[in-house]
Design a protein with these regions (language model features):
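Nucleotide-activated chemistry modules centered on ATP-dependent adenylation/adenylyltransferase
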Residues: 1-376
């Protein structure tokens, strides 16, 4: 038979309007859903601090600092035998899917994921990376284990599509979006995500205005929240408005920034930079014909390949790191300014540059954090 399971990983810190919306949806649909409301202290990346690269929602060791009380219907670590303290939130998602598949003795398990390729390069790559097993050759599917799949039915929806559908069908929605609109936040920047990750850092200061009670509790929850809330959307860490101090090149400014960091943090950035430089020299990143022409127009030395391992019409381009480049597709081009932005945003994983965590990096991070836990 068929069964509908609703899984929500509760990250403890959220706008009260978001929590109200989730509660409303769950209550309205309890007759058709088997609800798993998960409150587990897995590790979650944070970009608010140079010293704390992750935090744990619902960490029993910091119960006195919790931003809110745990929901009464919460499922805690004792319900999930696969959980361990080294686990990241995305690791938990995968292991939960496997566990549920076995618990239900299912023939096949499908996990619907609401990501859209428009949201970020990493989400675009989830769909189009071309090196994955699929369900019946549907490109918006990924096999994560035998007979266990992730499906991304909204992968090609634009932000405007969501609101057109909402207006047409009269769906309930998170009223936080109304406040975002009234605050002048553009549609494509209205994110309802964990407030400490890089994608949400620019809107972090809105907590002070929209949900001051939650903001007051957040200050003591994760290191660096106050700074990120003040400067996350200004020259100090802004992506578009960052300015180079007088007398520096972007490379020398990057070297200065690295010199101010703790050794283990600095080494992680240097490892990412080394990998990126080698990648662009030896393999090359894929760029559109339009971007390639912009590089040619600026007399930037490049080597263009014929094909790529990715399923894309873009061409692989090998090139050296630039100091800076003033084009709309700035994020796609390797530059020391791009690296500076990662450092200023406390983007420990260099997600802004298109990096994703590897298992080896997770292990290195675990070892480093264990070694330096007395100062974190």
């Amino acid at each position: 038979g068929l069964g509908d399971v609703y899984k929500r990983q509760d990250y403890e810190v959220q706008y009260s309007m978001t929590i109200d919306y989730v509660n409303r949806v769950l209550e309205t649909n309890r007759d058709i859903l088997d609800v798993y409301r998960i409150c587990v202290p897995f590790r979650v990346t944070t970009c608010t601090s140079m010293y704390q690269s992750y935090w744990r929602p619902w960490d029993e060791q910091k119960k006195e600092a919790w931003v809110r009380e745990m929901p009464k219907d919460a499922m805690k670590v004792d319900k999930f035998p696969f959980y361990n303290r080294k686990m990241w939130d995305y690791d938990f998602q995968i292991e939960f899917s496997r566990w549920l598949h076995l618990q239900k003795a299912a023939r096949r398990t499908c996990c619907l994921v609401g990501i859209r390729t428009q949201e970020s390069y990493n989400r675009w790559r989830t769909i189009y990376r071309g090196v994955k097993k699929q369900y019946k050759n549907c490109m918006w599917s990924t096999e994560i284990d035998e007979n266990v799949y992730n499906l991304y039915p909204l992968y090609d929806w634009k932000t405007e599509d969501i609101w057109v559908a909402n207006g047409k069908f009269g769906w309930d929605y998170n009223k936080l979006y109304d406040l975002y609109y009234q605050a002048g936040v553009s549609l494509d920047r209205q994110r309802v995500a964990s407030p400490f990750i890089s994608e949400a850092i620019e809107s972090l200061a809105l907590y002070k205005v929209i949900d001051p009670e939650t903001w007051g509790k957040m200050i003591g929850r994760v290191n660096g929240i106050g700074f990120a809330g003040l400067y996350g959307n200004t020259h100090a860490a802004g992506r578009k408005s960052i300015r180079l101090p007088e007398g520096y090149t972007w490379k020398s400014f990057m070297e200065f920034l690295l010199s101010t960091l703790p050794e283990h943090t600095r080494n992680r950035y240097l490892a990412k930079l080394k990998t990126s430089i080698r990648f662009w020299k030896e393999k090359g990143g894929v760029l559109s014909d339009e971007v390639i022409q912009k590089l040619k127009d600026r007399n930037i030395p490049i080597q263009i390949g014929d094909n790529s391992n990715y399923k894309t019409e873009k061409k692989p381009v090998r090139m050296d790191y630039l100091d800076d480049i003033d084009i709309e597709e700035f994020r796609e081009i390797p530059s020391y300014k791009r690296m500076c932005i990662c450092i200023l945003r406390n983007d420990h994983t260099c997600k802004y540059m298109g990096f994703a965590l590897t298992k080896e990096e997770n292990e290195m991070k675990s070892n480093a954090l264990e070694k330096y836990k007395h100062i974190l």
